[in-house]
Amino acid sequence: MDIDDILREVDPTFHSIPQEKRDLQELTRAWIAERSAPELLAWPADGLFERINDNIKQQIEKVEEMTGDMDPKTNFALIVIQTELERYRYLVRSYLRARIAKIDRHTLHYLSTDDLRARLSEMELAYATRHQALLHNHYLSSFLSSFPANLQNLNDAAAGISMIETPDLESAVFIRALKDTPVEARGVDTDAYADLKESDIVILRWADAKKLVEAGTAELV
């Protein structure tokens, strides 16, 4: 289920909203989710960022055209467009920075399997691959070259213990129910079960909340 299907169920009028406004809503949701989740979420695969980038380019062109017109009647419209443009830019920059920070922190983890690599965009994958290569070369020139060859790998799993650092999936997140749904939460001493109503907000371990978010029955807040 993609975000359009989720939003259509939650708000039947969603597709009557202009595409530009829907894209802004989806971008905002993606930004909030990425900043809230302890691990990297999947890159939007519905062409969202291509449309966002096209819209930003169009707004920049419009601002450039209107800047040459000093008619006081157009000044207010120019301010509105510039404000909207800055909002788009802020959301995109903040979203990408949140993702890059996660990639930098756990590069080997996100390069370790095809499923994890699929979460990255093409540019992010190229960045992560190059970043890890540079880091490994730096370690080799600094100290790893003095180690035996079998101890120079950064992804060693000797004795069944992996050297790859992974995100903390047990960290807490806030989620909002998008529909009535049952919730199972694992505790230290016992597990808990609850029935969430639409719009209810609860705090859960990400490991428990993840399946609800991926199924589209809840969103990160």
Curated annotation (Swiss-Prot):
Cellular location(s): Nucleus
InterPro entries hit by this protein: GINS_A, GINS_bundle-like_dom_sf, GINS_Sld5, SLD5_C, Sld5_GINS_A
GO biological-process terms attached to the record: chromosome segregation; DNA-templated DNA replication; double-strand break repair via break-induced replication
Keyword check for Nucleus: yes
Stated role: The GINS complex plays an essential role in the initiation of DNA replication. Has a role in chromosome segregation.
Complex and partners: Component of the GINS complex which is a heterotetramer of SLD5, PSF1, PSF2 and PSF3.
Similarity comment: Belongs to the GINS4/SLD5 family.
Name of this chain's protein: DNA replication complex GINS protein SLD5
